[in-house]
Amino acid sequence: MDISCEIEECKTREQQNSKRSAKACWGTVFSDLGALMSIALPMLMYFTFTKNDFDTSPLLKVVMLLFPCSYSAAGYFLLCYSSRTAHHKTGILYHLLNVLLVTFAAISILSIIVLPIEKWSKRLLGVYSMPSSSFVVSLTYLLYTSCDLTTASFTDTGITAFVELLSLLFLMSYPIFLTRNPEYYPYLSIISAILILARSFKEKYFPNKKTSESVVRWRLLIFFVILGFTTFSYIMAGLSCLHIIKEKCENFAGNQQILNK
């Protein structure tokens, strides 16, 4: 009887381990390959099509925004799902985190719908295809990979935290680069992709080890800094979308008044 129970337990553990391995594999494909593709494809579209192509075909605008914004929305929904299946669900902070993640995903989806209706200048086309895309993807990647919300655990050797801080500082410097010549825009996407590759390479060939309690607190601080910066960035993105909607509604109302006269 005991032997049969042990066999059943072994089978159960093997099934759970295989599920974890599959989940980890798909998580890696999404977080790494998905991020790199979401940065590269909009940049490729920018150099493949002309501004006139985007003006005459709004669908191209949608496709360009679809890659980074879909990656962003999917990443935050996955984080929300991980948070809901977490072992530790503590009160207000748990619910606030879920609300924030769903809000980030909703703003990402709203951006796909709203931004294409705006008239894009040559400079704005460059911004949406490179700095904006790499910014959104890198920010999502940082938050997605900085913590396992299912177990509320951090695994780090110190190098990963350094790469995360470097990526965060680079993202914070984006407004400075946006004021520069658009010729610099491709470098923002390339550097963002390199930082993602560096973190992925480190995780694959030098996997993290469990850290002490003190380092966990330090990593928790990094996570909240990333979350705070992400919140600020998506508030600005949401306000920008609302401003575009407001302008379009005012223009529509003005045109209706002219027609009625």
Curated annotation (Swiss-Prot):
Pfam families: DUF2463 (PF09591). InterPro entries: UPF0328. This is UPF0328 protein ECU03_1620. Belongs to the UPF0328 family. It comes from the Eukaryota.
